[in-house]
Design a protein with these regions (language model features):
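Short loop/turn segments that connect beta-strands within beta-propeller blades
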Residues: 44-47, 86-89, 130-134, 170
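Repeat-blade elements of multi-bladed beta-propeller folds
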Residues: 10-40, 54-82, 101-126, 143-167
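A short beta-strand motif characteristic of beta-propeller blades
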Residues: 6-14, 49-54, 92-100, 134-139
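Short, small-residue-biased leader/transition segments that mark boundaries at the very start
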Residues: 1-3
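Short, positively charged, low-complexity/disordered linker segments
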Residues: 125-128, 136-137
Length: 170
């Protein structure tokens, strides 16, 4: 028999009626999450103890982690992608890049490959941002929210959208 024990909660007994795709990202002995409460939270991996929380930006559940684990990425409700330093003792933002999308709430996980962060938006948009925060490109593919990204054995990147469309990203 397996018993699950809660390690942490945000202290609220309220339900959040919004997309709630909370994906834990683990780096350097820490767990990073963004929940529907729109706060970036960092927990100690071993104990579950809350190390810090930050609500300086209206964060959403789109998150990712750099290949080397040094940067945690999250999207904001203002259509930005932010990167924070995972080794810092407190919240330390490295950069925040405007994707040019305006109000944004889609919770498709970010995909990180070869130093590029890929994110999908609520209106059929996909953007690529360099690990230094440079917006490389942003394209409108369709009209619905992005679901997820997957890399094929040949290295090509694929993404899907809620309206059933599938796209290959070169």
């Amino acid at each position: 028999r397996v018993l699950f024990r809660s390690k942490w909660n945000n202290g609220s007994g309220s339900l959040f009626f919004s997309p709630g795709h909370v994906v834990p990202r683990i780096a350097g002995g820490k767990v990073f999450i963004v929940a529907p409460d729109r706060v970036v939270t960092c927990l100690d991996l071993a104990t579950g103890k809350q190390l810090w929380r930050d609500n300086s930006r209206k964060s959403r559940e789109t998150t990712g982690l750099s290949g080397d684990g040094r940067r945690f990425y999250y999207k904001t409700m203002d259509g930005e992608l932010a990167a924070i330093d995972t080794s810092a003792e407190r919240y330390r933002e490295l950069w925040c890049t405007d994707l040019g999308w305006g109000y944004e709430y889609n919770s498709c996980p970010a995909f990180v490959r070869d130093g590029v962060v890929y994110v999908a938006g609520r209106h059929g948009t996909v953007a690529a941002v360099g690990e230094d925060g440079t917006l490389l490109w942003s394209v409108k593919c369709c009209n619905s929210g992005g679901n997820d990204f997957a890399q094929a054995p040949d290295g090509s990147l694929w993404t899907t959208f809620a309206e059933g469309k599938v796209f290959r990203i070169p």
